[in-house]
Amino acid sequence: MQKYSHLPQLEVGILFSPEICFRLNGIFTCRTTGKKYTGAYNIRQTEDGYLLSQADHREPVSLPLTFEPEDDTTSDFDLTDVVIGIQFHWERKENQKFKGKLKIIDEQKHLTAINILSLEDYLLSVISSEMRATSSAEFLKAHAVISRSWLLAQINKAKTVRGTYSSYRVDQEEYIRWYDREDHAHFDVCADDHCQRYQGISKAYTPAVREALEATRGEVLTYEGTICDARFSKCCGGATERFDNTWEPVVHPYLDKITDAPEDLETGDLRDEQTARKWILSFPPAFCHTTDRQILSQVLNDYDQETQHFFRWQVSYPAEQLSELVYRKIGIDFGTIRDIQPIERGVSGRLIRVKITGDKKTLVIGKELIIRKTFSESHLYS
């Protein structure tokens, strides 16, 4: 672990909608229009361009627009109906409050609200959006270091791959795709689970969170002199997966299989189907296998606690419903699905390639997340 001195400004994509409603609390300046703004507004696209409205006042504007607070210490802004948990089982809308600048751009299919702020201010919210701000001090410190490392690794990587990155491999026999922050072209990271949860300042203002951030300021994880592309999860099911089996096909030696247990937990080779089956049907003594409501309420936000059976779970569908679901989720018409066969498992036992056989088509799909998306209205649990 080392200290990182250059902490950049970030652009975080918050809200994606045909119309964006926001409130500027304080005086904000927009250089595009040369005007000052305060109060409640909405912006939407019309046949003649973009219209910024406040009460009865209508103002044609050109995008992008950036609203910059005159006093960053006392000013903030609110965004209405921010969708969190996008396409996950906890998806919902929240009204959220942010510090820093508000930038609005056009991404063709929708308008996008972007928050521009410092990295450390961003982390102040992230560590209490991903976990509850009442978590123990060491939990908060660890999360601050992990989240800072992940973010800086993405920023450094973007300098080398922008415009050249592909996150899928498709041919007649396989549809292989993975998801990462490279899905975003017009800002650094998004504010949702796709990247890291960043839900504004309302959840972040606790002394413990600020103290954890200050205690670890600038600290990052490194491997052979390079900032680690650190990843985290709330529940690993007893064993973690290798990076290249879940995301892009790049091996990071520091992101390999480990067991989540007080002692080295013997799992066997979980790439083997029979061994994996035995593991999945068991309940090993893992740290994340807890039903202690007091612990869970201390570390998890309310909507995360709605998921009761997160360590082991089961989902079933009638064949006709499953066939329709798969077609709707990935746009591939298998006809009536006759068989689903595991082709490859990762070192944690997770499926990373699955063969779907229908009366119209047979295809292998992967990686882990596209499998979870394909067989669920939202996502299967990981």
Question: Which residues does each predicted region cover?
Answer:
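Conserved, single-site charged/polar hotspot
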Residues: 1-382
